[in-house]
Amino acid sequence: MTEPTYIPLRLHTEFSITDGMVRIKKLIAKAQEYGLPALGISDLMNEFGLVKFYKACRSAGIKPIGAADVRIGNPDAPDKPFRAMLIIRNDAGYLRLSELLTAAYVGKDRNVHHAELNPEWLENGDNSGLICLSGAHYGEVGVNLLNGNEDAARAAALKYAAWFPDAFYLELQRLPERPEWEACVSGSVKLAEELGLPVVATHPTQFMSRDDFNAHEARVCIAGGWVLTDKKRPRDFTPSQFFIPPETMAERFSDLPEALENTVEIAKRCNLHITLGKNFLPLFPTPDGLSLDDYLVKLSNEGLQERMVQLYPDEAERAAKMPEYQERLDFELNIIIQMKFPGYFLIVQDFINWAKTHGCPVGPGRGSGAGSLVAYSLKITDLDPLKYALLFERFLNPERVSMPDFDVDFCQANRGRVIEYVREKYGAEAVSQIVTFGTMSSKAVIRDVGRVLELPFTLCDKLSKLIPLEANKPLGLDDAMKAEPQIQELIEAEEADELITLAKKLEDLTRGLGMHAGGVLIAPGKISDYSPVYQADESASPVSMYDKGDVEDVGLVKFDFLGLRNLTIIEMAQNNIKNTTGDIVDVGTIPLDDQTAYQIFRDANTTAVFQFESTGMKKMLKTAHTTKFEELIAFVSLYRPGPMDNIPDFVARMKGQEFQYIHPLLEGILAPTYGIMVYQEQVMQAAQIIGGYSLGGADLLRRAMGKKKPEEMVKHREIFAEGAAKQGISREKSDEIFNYMEKFAGYGFNKSHAAAYALISYQTAWLKAHYPAEFMAATMSSELDNTDQLKHFYDDCRANGIEFLPPDINESDYRFTPYPDMKIRYALGAIKGTGEAAVESITSARQSGGKFTGLLDFCERVGKEHMNRRTLEALIRGGAFDSIEPNRAMLLANIDLAMNNADQKAANANQGGLFDMMEDAIEPVRLIDAPMWSESEKLAEEKTVIGFYLSGHPFGPYAQEVRQIAPQKLSKLKPQDSVRLAGFVTAVRTMMGKRGKIAFVSLEDLSGQVEIMVGGQTLENCADCLKADQVLIIESKVSRDDYGGGDGLRILANQVMTLQTARERYARSLSLALAPHHDIGELVQLLAAHQLPDTPRIPLQLSYANEKASGRLQVPPKWTVTPSSALFGELETLLGSRSVRVNW
């Protein structure tokens, strides 16, 4: 093989995040095409892509060179750091670069404004494992050369040469578009000759081909928040910065061949080695000098004894059961010790038991770990695996060596405390979370590129929304354009070809950084010895620079600390129960055969019940009539794509329909699921019983079936048939059983996971059945910021007979508060514009000084630090002051006066002396009067901060009236060809369907809400009247929504009328309810103005009421009026909507 002439060293991949769009897979393919024996990448201040690059190079037979393009602090211009490239020479260099990058993000003396290396770190540290390139025109040497300061350039070169003895190169770059760089090249060559330093040529690669330049500019603008036409935006890159072949570099540096030769020399000096496939567990301290093996055995046996007392209180029964449990425990312990995983189990049980004893609720289990009796004995899980036939081999297979993986659910509110405990136990430097990479999906990239191209938002939004979803993920742009022709039509109509061209180039490129939902790394020492650490800002948690797959490859062990909202709900509900009733409830000890709890499932009353909230699940429950826990486990497993097809058969068999097992030998394992394979564990057990597999081997078979690898399936089919033949089973029957297993292995569910989650489902249902107000208050408190969910739960509460008390500054807390007799006080924290700190200041003032007496008193006592004008307005609009002053308009009018008064009193109090003596002489503040809002105004204002109507409903004043012609309640709708509906419009949205424009109208009455489709000619006829915040009467057709699943309804409008139009068409008389405050003279004038000649008129009916009496007034026959929208509107403005009623 000929000696290479040039090795690329400087290259930004997509993992530079703010620039660079080189994808590693394409890079390696092009490097092979160029015949490169070695290749380097140097992402900006990170090593996010290093492991992926390393593995790809090794697979392609290319020597990987790891490096980072680093910023180095510039004390003379802190906002303009210098640049250099640090290349890994050996293992020491790998650790050193990781250490430096970690210090730049999480070190105590880091730059908090942007990540950079402190020059002192380089001066004082051991850099012997690194090679440094000067950074060309961006480096300290190059900047000074371009500024004409040769002395400073010389001093910098000597400084770096001292930091990196025999490993510092002056870097040379040439681009056709950058002739000004030549001064840096010539100056560097001159310095090199003078100081005896080597030079090296690099090409600053940012993208793969020249025609990627515009897309790369768009990528830089997306990251920086600029638009492409902005003349002030940075233009740091040129079209020449693509991945050029060695021949181009040879031409470009033909006058400096040694600069090219040194790229090869550097490649030879570098030997990057990353250890892959070896696990590094943290050291777990054990007492009394016990080994990890002995300590695990000790804790497991002690824990089993404790569990057995709980499971079998009767001593004789416990003694009879103990041998079975002890045998299973010993079996598991032997495998765990044989596979060298005692340390893993001990670490997990330690932080879980710390959480349980420090007020941090932990889930009963998650994933296959619930199948381990050792885990149950150590209190890692809380479900007896023997009782529910859960298999250890599904979790830890002795025939397939891989790390065990406990996914642990913690109460969301306390999860951080457990992670902090781990930090304290193992050291902060040994613990971090895991980075994730956000990419530009097809929908997102359309919006991003559209913004930098300054295209109309409506166009980009429309295009983005046209992209279809598949399995809840948007299709790629190419597939989307094939599936949805409207995309291409819209692009052509709007001349948006450039948008699609750039979007396709950027699609799926790494765009941003995130944090893995639950993964926590614990290392045997510093995390940075295995992966550099990144931290977005002061408030963020440190994360590894390697993602989940990469950290596992380098041997770091991931522990999953997942936050589960439902555990927080259960904990809050238990506290609520204690506060309201005095009962001490521990859902971990409730019986699993409580039929009151199962009635919740039978009634499909499962809103807020974990895993059973969806419409489709409720539909299944209505037909199932479940009575036992095993059925809940099956439902959790069945209600998913694929297994859902078996639900009708499963339910029918539950109810007594006869069925046959596929083979009598499988009756024992299939009986709990009525002959249907539901769980992965059943596939494994069938392989064991029929095919003679060990459970470990059966797990390998299950995995092979799931992956559908033909060559493996042929092999396993023969093994299975041989085992079946030993049982006297024919080849035809064994193939039938094998095919049946293969079908279910593809989508069978992990029973251990289903059982653990079914337990949480049952616990939440039990709480809802026995303590509904306490449970629902906790549920709503977990969703304070989610208005849609709060409305959903509010409606469910009302349907279950729970009464809501309004928010009240003298009664409410931050969260929802349950009261005896099925009442819940609305939470101040659920009012938009408040916050926990603001509410804390209210409750604190209330506790120390008693109830508030008015707005002035409130403002004087509640600290201004957290109670700003916006928060005060929100509380007033939400009705939180109604108990001390029901006139919300008047309170709003006096906010400035009240806050200024509070400020003045605080200032006077600080002065003391004379002001104290004058306090009594100061004239009291008088509040400004203001007319009360009408009912509709009050509700509209209330909705802006509550999110829905709480103290009333805008449909209320009209309900009795419109029920005369539209008696159907929305909550009681059933399929029917024609029905007249009435309600208040809360929202209208439109979209383009295949047959044209469609409007979706959200309609509410006092019983519930529906969505009505309006299209075609009907939409054309009523387009002007489809607006929110009005009453509509709609002639509709109601049918079953088979497409949507569950028992949803599809409602199609045939005719739409506003209330005013309906009144004009159907009114027979007009009733007006008068009160002392009404202006009768103005009323008479108004009515007279609507006695139009030559028009149909309707008679008036008047009533009058004051504090002493009420009665009907006789109206002369001549007082008839012409019904019209104008008349009804004016009357409602004058008298109020509740005083005007049309009789139909």
From Swiss-Prot:
Q: Where in the cell is it found?
A: Cytoplasm
**What top-tier enzyme class does this entry carry?**
transferase
Name the InterPro entries on file. DNA_pol3_alpha_NTPase_dom (IPR011708), DNA_pol3_alpha_thumb_dom (IPR041931), DNA_pol3_finger (IPR040982), DNA_pol_IIIA_C (IPR048472), DnaE2/DnaE/PolC (IPR004805), DNAPol_HHH (IPR029460), NA-bd_OB-fold (IPR012340), NA-bd_OB_tRNA (IPR004365)
Q: Main location per UniProt?
A: cytoplasm
Gene Ontology molecular functions: 3'-5' exonuclease activity; DNA-directed DNA polymerase activity; nucleic acid binding
- What biological-process terms (Gene Ontology) are attached? DNA replication
* Record has Nucleotidyltransferase as a keyword: yes
Q: What are the record keywords, sorted?
A: Cytoplasm, DNA replication, DNA-directed DNA polymerase, Nucleotidyltransferase, Transferase
Reactions the enzyme catalyzes: DNA(n) + a 2'-deoxyribonucleoside 5'-triphosphate = DNA(n+1) + diphosphate
One Pfam family from the record? HHH_6
GO cellular component terms, alphabetically, are:
cytoplasm
UniProt key word Ubl conjugation:
no
| Transmembrane segment boundaries | none
Per the similarity annotation, which family is this? Answer: Belongs to the DNA polymerase type-C family. DnaE subfamily.
Subunit and interaction comment: DNA polymerase III contains a core (composed of alpha, epsilon and theta chains) that associates with a tau subunit. This core dimerizes to form the PolIII' complex. PolIII' associates with the gamma complex (composed of gamma, delta, delta', psi and chi chains) and with the beta chain to form the complete DNA polymerase III complex.
Q: What is this protein called?
A: DNA polymerase III subunit alpha
Q: Organism, per UniProt?
A: Neisseria meningitidis serogroup A / serotype 4A (strain DSM 15465 / Z2491)
